[in-house]
Amino acid sequence: MAPSSLKWTLLCALPWTLASPASYNVHHARDSDAQAFSPPYYPTPHGGWIADWAEAYEKASQLVRNMTLAEKVNLTTGTGMYMGPCAGQTGSVPRFGIPNLCMHDGPLGVRNTDHNTAFPPGITVGATFDKDLMRSRGVALGEEGRGKGVNVLLGPSVGPIGRKPRGGRNWEGFGADPSLQAIAGSLTIEGMQSTGLIACIKHFIANEQEMHRMSSVVTQGYSSNVDDRTLHELYLWPFAEGVRAGVGSLMAAYNDVNNSASSQNSKMLNDILKDELGFQGFVMSDWFGNYGGVSAALAGLDVSMPGDGAIPLLGDSYWGSELSRSILNGTVPVDRLNDMATRILASWYKMGQDQDYPLPNFSANTEDAEGPLYPGAVFSPKGVVNKFVNVQGDHNVTARAIARDAITLLKNNNNILPLHRNDSLKIFGTDAGTNPDGINSCSDKGCNKGVLTMGWGSGSSKLPYLVTPQEAIANISSHAEFHITDSFPSDVSAGPNDIAIVFINSDSGENYITVEGNPGDRTSAGLNAWHNGDDLVKAAAEKFRQVVVVYHTVGPVLMEEWIDLEPVKAVLVAHLPGQEAGWSLTDVLFGDYSPSGHLPYTIPRSESDYPDSVSLIQQPFGRIQDDYTEGLYIDYRHFAKAGITPRFPFGYGLSYTNFNFSRASISAQSSLDTAYPAPRSPKGSTPEYSTAIPPAAEAAWPKNFNRIWRYLYPYLDNPEGARANSSRKYPYPDGYSTVQKPGPRAGGGEGGNPALFDVAFSVQVQVTNTGARKGRAVAQLYVELPDSLGVDTPSRQLRQFEKTKILAPGESQVLTMEITRKDLSVWDVVAQDWKAPVNGEGVKMWIGESVADMRVLCTVGEGCSTL
């Protein structure tokens, strides 16, 4: 979501234009199967036709039938920025016991509060390739959010996916692959919602760069122009799995998609999300990402956050009272409002939040116990705002396990690692130490001082404590000398047996904060180490015979200046470790655990290895067009197609031991005797309501009502005057209709046609620890599709993975991976359906420890062989 900075709010929200998105002219060439702009799709499909949601929708619909116009509208509109304890909150319905729903960040912990856990972010979780940890972290996030009284925790993030290596918020997601994002995201959702908290999957969709994601005084926000097949096979894939997991809410992105704003893009929200994917929850805007009133409601937006209009902090809104007016004058059908309110309440009921769910016991606006209840109001009533509830439990154990099991060993010449406790160590780099100003001194982590634990922005969290690498190493070794500086000391001595450990990092974040010339994206730093980190490594390599590099990074980095230097014996990527930075690292450095992390992205030799189309768009004026001309070929898919050997491939990661893959087998589980899945079932019934425009009195101010200045209400001063005027007609978009559609052939359930998720093949492989130390291995399964499908496909696509338990030397474990029909399918842009090779003929499945290190080949119809 957006930041809480008042300065940012005023500067960035002023210039929004209110033009219809369909009015933008397309001035660039497009593929024949692409859309110049998102075509219309109306009306918004009703929710409630999925059997698993039937009980929740029945409860919600009974309530909505008895609610007034103002009560329904109140559910859909935030109360305004700084008008409550959370990042945002909806209006309440006291008559039915519906509280303000607290919507709060974030994806790695409860933001701007106390006694919380600062977990490792998504990119670190992805590097573990550990499904159990992915779900466990989700459970812990849910427990902490619920414990603080958060109704909707704004995560996980599966967009951006990492199309652009310099992208500022890539670290919030799980890696540069749709299946990795999908598996990690859906397991996170399952864990979070098992606690009764509502998860919010974001940012929908194609939000791959921070710079120009929103309009400025001189530049309109960019449009992500992506063709239909690429959208389905890359960017939609993780959202589909999140919907299949039953996610209760979704956040629309700031950017346009095919020249239509994400929050009022009827093709994306009505057609693809709510009809094709069968999404049953509610869609909210990102903060100040709702750019219109009627257009957004008709296009499928259900909640406007934080509620304010084009000029925040003045108490106006595109929705709120204006939505009440639009209902009374018939511009927005009552049917649409009923569905909006029902979707919100259905999610509330589905997660059991009607059963003694706690109210917010914190304030994101102050650390004081008492203060204004509505900080955005000049004359706010005051009261207790912080109860300092400790929600940490034993979640530090999970946080440490994730940070530890994500650590990725890239190089280990002469087996210099693990270290011995009596080794003579010289430690260099500020990244080993703490922020001298305090671990939480920079708002939303908007600085790069000390060890890098997370990126900056609304996806960050306050650290309850921080164990730095310096502290952890000093606790273990009495032979360590620390030089916490980014300039190599001229007077340092180097003994023949000394080992230099150099800590460097690369940072990024959200664009409302600029850090050292980087406005979110890594525009200034590029993929290089910050604070002259590359020079620090080279200086150490000139002085010492043995150098170990520890890299904390948000994503891909360049290492060519020093990776092949003879003294550089070992390289560890520790990603973003959160609060357990020190202990997780020493667990691996000193050999209590073998490293078992794998790269969730490719590390290139040069930025020129990437296609030009994934560079940051830095156009200074006008409307920015970001054309996804690379199609399906991002990250490792591109490197393979272009024949470029990266420095380290996707999925790469060494261990202190070795593993053998053997005794693989493949067995068919369900029929693939047709190219397309079995036809979908018709939609089930949905709640029915009166479509009559309600009495104007339902939008009138209650008598003797005590208004709070700037608080956004659904009431009208003159509701009778809002009635329809036959002389004025609203200019509805092309294709507008109020007739419900039967739904696309690719739909039929949450995530799409249920037949897509039939298990087509089960693959087993035995993994044996053949080394001398205990450790864990990751089996990665990549699919190669045959040419018979008639379309170009990437040579290998990750579709599944499993991680072993800790295996003792000589110990084995059999891993099972299931491959669905969808895993073997391509999106047919003509049929508008998923197409698989009949009987799986010609499909190859490769199993290995990275995309470039294959150990087993399984061919459908032929069996498996060890390579």
Swiss-Prot record:
Gene3D superfamilies: Glycoside hydrolase family 3 C-terminal domain, Glycoside hydrolase, family 3, N-terminal domain, Immunoglobulins. Keywords: Carbohydrate metabolism, Cellulose degradation, Glycoprotein, Glycosidase, Hydrolase, Polysaccharide degradation, Secreted, Signal. It comes from the Eukaryota. It is found in: Secreted. The keyword Glycoprotein applies. The keyword DNA-binding does not apply. The active site is at 286. InterPro entries: Cellulose_deg_GH3, Fn3-like, Glyco_hydro_3_AS, Glyco_hydro_3_C, Glyco_hydro_3_C_sf, Glyco_hydro_3_N, Glyco_hydro_3_N_sf, Glycoside_hydrolase_SF. PROSITE patterns: GLYCOSYL_HYDROL_F3. Pathway: Glycan metabolism; cellulose degradation. GO terms for cellular component: extracellular region. GO terms for biological process: cellulose catabolic process. Its EC number is 3.2.1.21. It catalyses: Hydrolysis of terminal, non-reducing beta-D-glucosyl residues with release of beta-D-glucose. Residues 1-19 form the signal peptide. Glycans are attached at residues 66, 74, 258, 329, 361, 396, 422, 475, 660, 725. SUPFAM superfamilies: (Trans)glycosidases, Beta-D-glucan exohydrolase, C-terminal domain. One of its GO terms (molecular function) is beta-glucosidase activity. It is an enzyme of class 3 (hydrolase). SMART domains: Fn3_like. Residues 723-751 are annotated as: Disordered. Belongs to the glycosyl hydrolase 3 family. Beta-glucosidases are one of a number of cellulolytic enzymes involved in the degradation of cellulosic biomass. Catalyzes the last step releasing glucose from the inhibitory cellobiose. This is Probable beta-glucosidase F. It comes from Aspergillus terreus (strain NIH 2624 / FGSC A1156). The gene is bglF.
